[in-house]
Each structure stands twice: as structure tokens, then as C-alpha cells.
Amino acid sequence: MALEVKRKRVDVDLILDQEKAEQVAALGDDLQRAVSQHVTEGANAAAKRIAKQIVQLRDEVKDQTIRITFEALPLSKWRQVLEANTVTENGIPKQRIEDICADAIRSMVVKTVPETPVEDLANVMTELSDGQISPIWYAIRDLNAKLIDPKDALESASRIIRRRSAS
């Protein structure tokens, strides 16, 4: 039987309008704060108001938003992306996130809504603000560089189950 690796996927929404993207992010932060407040009587009116603002803003930027589905790369391809985008200056390796994102997008994008040419997405990376590119970078980085070692969790679970069985 041939082994088959199932690579993780993640969706990221890219809002091309920087100002609106920042407004959505700020409202998201406000919503988190409002939700974390302990409201004892009735519903959290502030959270509802902020949520409605986010939905309204989302509708306004619908035509300027691209949902990108990324799939993790095999290690050898991820290494090639990093090596191609690393330069050494005075013995110090340096990388530009926008260049890594552009190259990774060419290999990692499996779907876009609305349908958008992958090359167009790669080319727009140098035009994005830090706030716009950050969610893309975090998705790419986490899909390809996050340590996944379930051994400790499996061993801990086994010890706990054995202890409970012995009791």
C-alpha cells in the first residue's frame, strides 16, 4: 500500500482596500474586547453593535476581497522557497517576507474566490501593506514551519489512561 500524505489547508481573506482592511481589523479587536467583558444583564449590546458594523463593512469590501486557500508544501519545496529568497549580507542571512510570500503563493494556492490568476496574487505581494500581508505570511509560515510532534501528547494520554485504569 502506498503511503499518502494529507497536507493541511487554510483559508485567508485578502482585502485589497488597505483602509477598509484596517477598519475590519480594528473592529475585530473591538469585538474581542467587547465579548470578553462580563455582561450580567441581557445581551452584550456593544458586541452586537460592533458585529453589525463588521458585517456591513464586509459587504462593502466584498468585491475587493479574495479568499485564498493555501496548502502546505512538502519540506523540499518549502526549503527551495526559503533558499531562493535568502541573501547573505556581511555574513547575516536576510529574507523579505513579501518575496517569500510571492514565491510560496505560486506553489501553495489551490483555490481562490473569486477565481484569480495565481501570478496576479504573487505580483500584488509587494504592493500590500504590512497589515494586509501579515495574515498571508502567518498562514504560509504556520502551514510549512510549525512543529508537529504528537509523540508527547500521545504518551501523556497513555499514562493518564493507564493510571485511571489502575485505580
List PLM regions with ranges:
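Short, intrinsically disordered N-terminal pre-domain segments
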Residues: 1-6
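Nucleic-acid-interacting cores, centered on viral/eukaryotic replication and modification enzymes
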Residues: 8-10, 142
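Predominantly late transmembrane helices and immediately cytosolic-facing juxtamembrane segments
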Residues: 11-17, 21-23
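Short, surface-exposed, charged amphipathic helix/loop patches that serve as local interaction elements
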Residues: 21-167
